[in-house]
Structure formats: C-alpha cells, structure tokens
Amino acid sequence: MVDDYTAKMTELIELMRLIGNDTQQCEVKECKRKISSTITDTLSAFSNGSGGWIILGLSEKNGFTPVEGFDARAMQEALSQACEKMTPVVRPVIVTCPFEGANLVFARIDEMLPRDKPCFTTALGPHG
C-alpha cells in the first residue's frame, strides 16, 4: 500500500519528468553529501508565497532520478535544522518516501499566515 505522501511525491516527479524541470510548487535538490545552500531561500519563498513541496535526494539534471548514496535520515535532520534557522520557524511535514528503490525526503511547506510574514533566514534579517 502506498501512503498519501508517497503517492503525491510520485505524482509530482512524474509531472517534472514530463515537463523537464521542477515547478513553482515543487523544488528538487540533490543533497548527496550536505543540505543545499539555497534551502533557506526555498523555505522562505514557499512560506511567504502559496506554499510548496521540497524533494531531497532527486537529481533534476539526471532526469529526476534518485541520487546514488543519498542519506535520507541525515538529510531529513538537516532540513529540520534549516527550518529552525528561519524567523518565524518553519514547521513543515517532513517524511521519508520510497521511490524507485531509494528513499527520498519529501516535505510540504505551508504558506504562513499574513500576520507571520515575512519569513526569513534569522541570521540575514528580514531584508537579507
């Protein structure tokens, strides 16, 4: 049985494979050895916009295929830590989902309430 998160992630990957790139609602990051340096930009954009999905461990340049050697557990923790570096703190749903023999990290970032915006990287400030 496939859970709802795995089904949604698979649906998004199939769409991105068809169109050849990630979308305004879904950002893909390889993150083989460490979390992407632009992850806080993505968290901010989705939190201040209309929300979105993040998939870690997937290679856009290799046709949206799983990254060999990706450590889902470590990257799930790194993503959680990145969320803590935001003001206000981003509280996504983060799950590990199976896909084509690998585990990927899948996160849903909700739009923040108007009173909580702007969401920004704490160290950079609201105009960073």
Stretch-by-stretch model annotation:
Residues M1-G128:
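Conserved N-terminal catalytic/coupling substructures associated with nucleotide/phosphate chemistry
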